[in-house]
């Protein structure tokens, strides 16, 4: 059987690429003749033409595995030099309609339909296999499939004439019927079509052509009319459901966009842009892409509405705060200025520009044209608002009697400072006498009870007197002056007495010292100007030299000193 099948040119790689020569056919014919049963009567021989050449690799009907070479020569015994008076077993009689005898009723199949009679159609080449694509990938070969790839077959009859079959036409066109009729005549001459087909009426031939057209379109892979995708039979249901889902989603998205566009407060520009976009959509765009774009625009519009609402909320809150603040200020003042504001607004335009007359002509003052007047031009102006009159008494003398009581010290209590020069001392005494108006000086502080050392006080007496004063001890509260230098015991006792004195000062709280004499306070005084505390003698001696606080240099008079108790 393989040798018989190898006689024709096949597209599959399992077959031989070149047809066998005529001697091989003779050998096969003689083998078949020897095995023929002599009891089977012979029938009228029928001419049969063998294809001598094929221009292109085409899907020939008898390349199918179910067809056998021996079945072609069934009851072909009358041909000289071939199978004479020999029939093949009935199991081999699986014939194509072109080679079937008249007594076999086989449904004719058009030569245009490149399909076998088996259950599975074999793929002839790699290009043919690639033409069947998935339903989810774009089609590569959508049209003009039969224009350039049409097969050219040449057949020869018994007389040696050759016939060429050229371009295939669609089965539904009128020209295809003519080609089929011409092909049938040629096949009838070559013995490839039965007498029943050639002798049939034109009506029968038209019916058979319709059946051929139906068989042609049924055998091809289906094509989706919407997205133009080739589909397999197993993908039809799934692809149809997918298209229906997209069709159902399309009206919903359109309706949602229309509702959003017709919402109250939508700007006219957005409505216009939405209508222009709907009109500008191309009809060839896929429903899935258009639905995606509509959803994207809807999301953008929702974002815009949310941002605008937030902004308006912030502005309204700020305006509300300003209004509440103004209302509070109006309530505090206790007066309503609504009527006055209305009057000002009415007369604002009339008094906006200041007019004056010069040389008999009315002119407008240029400064009133500027917003803000002189202040708008850059000049500094004083406030035009007049302060309300105040009946409060102005204290010019600085009388603090009601607040701090009567003055406790006067100018007579000040201890004057003695100068080194006689002329300067005389001037100080004259100035002091003028201030006191001839009154006697105060005796609050005497040299005997002074904390300041007498050697630091300059004196106008002779040198002997100064030496005697220098020999006197200045620390009246200490017993050190009773100690003599000759006795070490007395020195030790004096130190013990000093320690006990310091302990008593710490026990009674004398831990604060005057910053002038660096000793514990003796009758502390403070100034009502700066509230610094010093000893009485320190204040009076400082004011005798200058009328300033010894700590902060604030102007201080003797009447500003007050006695305090620590």
UniProtKB/Swiss-Prot annotation:
Pfam families referenced in this protein's UniProt entry, alphabetically: RNF220, zf-C3HC4_2
Compartment(s): Cytoplasm; Nucleus
GO CC aspect terms: cytoplasm; glutamatergic synapse; nuclear lamina; nucleoplasm; nucleus; postsynapse; protein-containing complex
Catalysed reaction equations from the record: S-ubiquitinyl-[E2 ubiquitin-conjugating enzyme]-L-cysteine + [acceptor protein]-L-lysine = [E2 ubiquitin-conjugating enzyme]-L-cysteine + N(6)-ubiquitinyl-[acceptor protein]-L-lysine
Region described as Disordered: 277-300
Statement: the UniProt record of this protein carries the keyword Cell inner membrane: no
PROSITE patterns from the UniProt entry: ZF_RING_2 (PS50089)
Keywords: Coiled coil, Cytoplasm, Isopeptide bond, Metal-binding, Nucleus, Phosphoprotein, Transferase, Ubl conjugation, Ubl conjugation pathway, Zinc, Zinc-finger
Tissues and organs where the protein is expressed, per its UniProt entry: In the brain, expressed in the hippocampus, telenecephalon and cerebellum. No expression in astro glial cells or in neural progenitor cells.
Enzyme Commission identifier(s): 2.3.2.27
Residue ranges that the Swiss-Prot or TrEMBL entry lists as coiled coil: 485-513
Gene Ontology process terms (BP): dorsal/ventral neural tube patterning; noradrenergic neuron development; positive regulation of canonical Wnt signaling pathway; protein autoubiquitination; protein monoubiquitination; protein ubiquitination; regulation of postsynaptic neurotransmitter receptor internalization
Zn finger (RING-type) start-end: 514-553
Function of the protein: E3 ubiquitin-protein ligase that promotes the ubiquitination and proteasomal degradation of SIN3B. Independently of its E3 ligase activity, acts as a CTNNB1 stabilizer through USP7-mediated deubiquitination of CTNNB1 and promotes Wnt signaling. Plays a critical role in the regulation of nuclear lamina.
Stated name of the protein: E3 ubiquitin-protein ligase Rnf220
Species assigned in the record: Mus musculus (Mouse)
């Amino acid at each position: 059987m393989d040798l018989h099948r190898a006689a024709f040119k096949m597209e599959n790689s399992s077959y031989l690429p070149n047809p066998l020569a005529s001697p091989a056919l003779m050998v096969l014919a003689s083998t078949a003749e020897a095995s023929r049963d002599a009891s089977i009567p012979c029938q009228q021989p029928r001419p049969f033409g063998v294809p001598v050449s094929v221009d292109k690799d085409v899907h020939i009907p008898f390349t199918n595995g179910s067809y056998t070479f021996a079945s072609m020569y069934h009851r072909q015994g009358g041909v000289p030099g071939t199978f004479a008076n020999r029939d093949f077993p009935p199991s081999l009689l699986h014939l194509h309609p072109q080679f079937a005898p008249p007594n076999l009723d086989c449904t004719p199949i058009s030569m245009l339909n490149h399909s076998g009679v088996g259950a599975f159609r074999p793929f002839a080449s790699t290009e043919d296999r690639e033409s069947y694509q998935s339903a989810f990938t774009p089609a590569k070969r959508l049209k003009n499939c039969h224009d350039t790839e049409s097969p050219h077959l040449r057949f020869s009859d018994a007389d040696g004439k050759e016939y060429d079959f050229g371009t295939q036409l669609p089965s539904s066109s009128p020209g295809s019927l003519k080609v089929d009729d011409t092909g049938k005549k040629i096949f009838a001459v070559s013995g490839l079509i039965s007498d029943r087909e050639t002798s049939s009426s034109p009506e029968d031939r038209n019916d058979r052509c319709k059946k051929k057209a139906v068989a042609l379109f049924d055998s091809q892979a289906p094509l989706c009319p919407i997205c133009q995708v080739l589909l397999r039979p197993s993908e039809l249901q799934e692809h149809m459901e997918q298209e229906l889902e997209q069709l159902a989603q399309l009206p919903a998205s359109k309706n949602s966009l229309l509702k959003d566009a017709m919402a109250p407060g939508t700007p006219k520009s957005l409505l216009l842009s939405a209508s222009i976009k709907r009109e500008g959509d191309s009809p060839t765009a896929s429903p899935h892409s258009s639905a995606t774009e509509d959803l994207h625009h809807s999301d953008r519009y929702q974002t815009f509405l949310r941002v605008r609402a937030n902004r308006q909320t912030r502005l309204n809150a700020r305006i509300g705060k300003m209004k509440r603040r103004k209302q509070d200020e109006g309530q505090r003042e206790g007066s309503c200025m609504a009527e006055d504001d209305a009057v000002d607004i009415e007369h604002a335009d009339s008094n906006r520009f200041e007019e004056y007359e010069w040389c008999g002509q009315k002119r407008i003052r240029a400064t009133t044209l500027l917003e803000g007047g002189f202040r708008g031009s850059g000049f500094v102006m004083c406030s035009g608002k007049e302060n309300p009159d105040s009946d409060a008494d102005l204290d010019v003398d600085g009388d603090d009697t009601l607040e701090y009581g009567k003055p406790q010290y006067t100018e007579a209590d000040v201890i004057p400072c003695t100068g080194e020069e006689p002329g300067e001392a005389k001037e100080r005494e004259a100035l002091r006498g003028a201030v006191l108006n001839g009154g006697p000086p105060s005796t609050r502080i005497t040299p005997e009870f002074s904390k300041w050392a007498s050697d630091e006080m300059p004196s106008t007496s002779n040198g002997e007197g100064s030496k005697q004063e220098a020999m006197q001890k200045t620390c009246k509260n200490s017993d050190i002056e009773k100690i003599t230098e000759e006795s070490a015991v007395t020195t030790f006792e004096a130190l013990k007495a000093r320690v006990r004195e310091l302990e008593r000062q710490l026990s009674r709280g004398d831990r604060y010292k005057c910053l002038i004499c660096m000793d514990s306070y003796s009758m502390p005084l403070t100034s009502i100007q700066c509230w610094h505390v010093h000893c009485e003698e320190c204040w009076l001696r400082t004011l005798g030299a200058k009328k300033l606080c010894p700590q902060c240099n604030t102007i201080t008079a003797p009447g500003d000193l007050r006695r305090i108790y620590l």
